[in-house]
């Protein structure tokens, strides 16, 4: 099937990454990409085992992640970027993100990077410095996962404070 083929391609790409010397793998599960499309009730209108309930919507991303994890060397670090909220009624919310992060942890995910949005046409995103840090904090508080915060974090002093305040374990700084 197409889904099985895509899963195999992810496994193959992950193994190539290890072979050429990558230090870790992060699966992109947000911003409207494939796994986000499965996870989001805004985009997933399937009526099979991959649609409907949160359990079903998580199924394919978890299957692919588990297949990658199983193929990698035993302690090779692998994480996933997840959506903390879609900023849209009826979309992924913090509670679903917590459940998904806990399910990832059960299958050996080493960390999650908590982002947001990406699937709604007109989300009401309160964009400002550090606007997604509270999402990382929510995931950190409700899971045992290592959590990375993102979102307009450009000041190294603030980045350090996020870690000191235990809002996240890691901080991504870019742009």
Predicted regions and their residues:
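Flavin-dependent oxidoreductase catalytic cores
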Residues: 1-175
